[in-house]
Amino acid sequence: MKYGKFLEEGGTIGFVAPSFGCNIEPYRTGFEQAQKKLQELGHKIWLGPNCYEGKGIGISNTPQLCGKELQEAYLSKESDVLISCGGGELMCEILDYVDFDRIKKADPKWYMGYSDNTNMTFLLTTLCDTASIYGPCAPAFGMNPWHPAIDDAYLVLTGKKRVLNGYNGWEKESLKDEEHPTEPYHITEEKVLHTFAGAEKVIHAQMQGRLIGGCMDCLVNLTGTKYDKVNEFTEKYKEDGFIWFLESCDL
């Protein structure tokens, strides 16, 4: 498997919007604050043409233009890593406008995003044999202060952290809105983990394997299409085992 180079001090972070852009609040201000914060940390910024667009349906622009932006940004030497501007609804429509053969042959580059970005993170891994990061989108880096999860995402991107642990709780209702675009996560719910071996509950579970997965809504759409190379991927790495992570949006 190929791994991108970690983001160095002075390196350039590229932002793309293959799903929603940051054209409305609270995402616009969050995105602008994220750029400011990352520049303060010593990085340069490169913006794709769709970052502030809202012309598309369920995505920032037309599928053709979103696909063009994503492909050109990944192949370009102008950025060292890529972070998506947001999730959305119809990123699946851009896939026919992305040349995954060229991406597979290109120098690997870290791509970070979640939700609708499964259409890139999952395919980079299973189709292009390139590691990706299922993590926060651009506006989250504008929250003040950073939650440990945001700090960890940055440290993973820079290669300064290779081992991650869970967090004490999770957000059920966000306080972020148009008037409070940089609110941090509103942690109110306790973390509870359950592990099972078949129908039997296991108290102390250990497992190992390659992490693959993403948003189930996106994975369902990819199943059985020409982009579905999961069988080949799992066969190639079957000795390693697999740990699936699954996010449920509307399913």
Name the predicted role of every residue range.
Residues M1-E78:
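ATP/NTP phosphate-donor binding region
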Residues L75-V98:
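Long, hydrophobic/aromatic-enriched structural stretches that serve as scaffold segments
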Residues A131-D217:
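Conserved anion/nucleotide-ligand pocket segment
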